Amino acid sequence: MNSGPLEFTVSANTNPATDAVRESILANPGFGKYYTDHMVSIDYTVDEGWHNAQVIPYGPIQLDPSAIVLHYGQEIFEGLKAYRWADGSIVSFRPEANAARLQSSARRLAIPELPEEVFIESLRQLIAVDEKWVPPAGGEESLYLRPFVIATEPGLGVRPSNEYRYLLIASPAGAYFKGGIKPVSVWLSHEYVRASPGGTGAAKFGGNYAASLLAQAQAAEMGCDQVVWLDAIERRYVEEMGGMNLFFVFGSGGSARLVTPELSGSLLPGITRDSLLQLATDAGFAVEERKIDVDEWQKKAGAGEITEVFACGTAAVITPVSHVKHHDGEFTIADGQPGEITMALRDTLTGIQRGTFADTHGWMARLN
């Protein structure tokens, strides 16, 4: 088995996007609509370990129709962003945390772990050839990076694959909120659950997202933007919003307290969540990780004790929650507008990511 450092080979795309096409895309990229000229591919076999590290032209991949990923969903993924700073450097936010979470997901899905140094080097290799796809500094645009691992061995037996492929693709991403931060309305899902104790909820695994689609469609039917998941046992404790972690602000000003659902094994351990817990502490706020049930949310929002609610994740960073619907009624958080603490934390985190705030925790890693 290969135990030494991987050497990447580079095969340049002979038909890349023209400067004009790329600039047109970067002017209005949306999310997940366009892709850069190249991608990274690394193979795994039991005998050779991780090997055959390549940067190749972006394009379709070949899979045997009986590949295990297509039948039993053995796959994992991550999501992170690359930002261009004013000094020309291209950076990413806590990529080592994404590498660690990919390893954690791999353990849960019986997939061999990709070493952190290989993960980080794959980001650098892709940026080296597709640097022009990173949007200019000064705005909220970024280059979204999607690393993932799929089980490629042919076979219909239900077992872990002996062959895998790590892939890294990149897609320019526009500002999540255009024309100002917009709060979202949410539907509390009592009928469906995202994950249960002992399940795959703490892994970033496609099956979790596929299983969420019906509940998300139900939320849309109820006139809501997103679904909020409750625990699988009692259907009363708040877990996540869509694929994002939730925070509740009790009180206001310097005496405010931030509460987020504790990591129970059925929640994704969000990197943005972890970072906001640190930034809130830095700002002097009390923070607490504990269970919070729906009744407490509604009663304390009605009494004015819960003053702000927001969700957090890589794509939107922070999304304010304004209105909640459920089977027995609905309620609004405060005046339904983004809260002061919500916006202050968002400004701090995005400022660190954009290089306009001091990175006192050493979270930003240069990729070029």
Swiss-Prot record:
It comes from Mycolicibacterium smegmatis (strain ATCC 700084 / mc(2)155). There is a cross-link at residue 299 (Isoglutamyl lysine isopeptide (Lys-Gln) (interchain with Q-Cter in protein Pup)). Belongs to the class-IV pyridoxal-phosphate-dependent aminotransferase family. Catalyzes the reversible transfers of an amino group from glutamate to the alpha-ketoacid of the respective amino acid in the final step in the biosynthesis of branchedchain amino acids. The amino acids can be ranked in the following order with respect to their efficiency as amino donor: Leu > Ile > Val. This is Branched-chain-amino-acid aminotransferase. Homodimer. Its EC number is 2.6.1.42. InterPro entries: Aminotrans_IV, Aminotrans_IV_CS, Aminotransferase-like, B_amino_transII, BCAT-like_C, BCAT-like_N, BCAT_family. SUPFAM superfamilies: D-aminoacid aminotransferase-like PLP-dependent enzymes (SSF56752). The modification N6-(pyridoxal phosphate)lysine is found at residue 204. GO terms for molecular function: branched-chain-amino-acid transaminase activity; L-isoleucine-2-oxoglutarate transaminase activity; L-leucine-2-oxoglutarate transaminase activity; L-valine-2-oxoglutarate transaminase activity; pyridoxal phosphate binding. Pyridoxal 5'-phosphate binds at residues 101, 209, 271-272, 314. Inhibited by ammonium sulfate at millimolar concentrations and by O-benzylhydroxylamine (Obe). Its cofactor is pyridoxal 5'-phosphate. The gene is ilvE. PROSITE patterns: AA_TRANSFER_CLASS_4 (PS00770). It catalyses: L-isoleucine + 2-oxoglutarate = (S)-3-methyl-2-oxopentanoate + L-glutamate; L-valine + 2-oxoglutarate = 3-methyl-2-oxobutanoate + L-glutamate; L-leucine + 2-oxoglutarate = 4-methyl-2-oxopentanoate + L-glutamate. GO terms for biological process: branched-chain amino acid metabolic process; isoleucine biosynthetic process; L-leucine biosynthetic process; L-valine biosynthetic process; protein-pyridoxal-5-phosphate linkage via peptidyl-N6-pyridoxal phosphate-L-lysine.
